[in-house]
């Protein structure tokens, strides 16, 4: 279920403050954040934000196509290693 239109999109206030300060100074630094639920705003375009995936911070360059999505969508939390491979031993027993 999506968020109510009446409430508006959520952005972590500290993250938004850092972005606005960097835009005012015309800086481009990597910003670390744990706020995966924050919505990407147009002010964030062109910045690199390191989003926490549970183990490390994944750097994500924000482009125009990402506006409106959540930061967590671009930092996967699970890595799929694949199912067990077929070996000679497992196929010979059948």
UniProtKB/Swiss-Prot annotation:
GO BP, sorted A to Z: ribosomal small subunit assembly; translation
Biological source species: Acetivibrio thermocellus (strain ATCC 27405 / DSM 1237 / JCM 9322 / NBRC 103400 / NCIMB 10682 / NRRL B-4536 / VPI 7372) (Clostridium thermocellum)
Name of the molecule in the record: Small ribosomal subunit protein uS19
Tagged with keyword rRNA-binding: yes
Gene3D superfamilies membership: 30s Ribosomal Protein S19, Chain A
Family, per entry: Belongs to the universal ribosomal protein uS19 family.
Any coiled-coil regions, as ranges: none
InterPro entries per record: Ribosomal_uS19, Ribosomal_uS19_bac-type, Ribosomal_uS19_CS, Ribosomal_uS19_SF
Record-level GO cellular component terms: cytoplasm; small ribosomal subunit
Its biological purpose: Protein S19 forms a complex with S13 that binds strongly to the 16S ribosomal RNA.
Keyword RNA-binding: yes
HAMAP family reported for this sequence: Ribosomal_uS19
Keywords linked to the UniProt accession: Ribonucleoprotein, Ribosomal protein, RNA-binding, rRNA-binding
GO molecular function, one term: rRNA binding
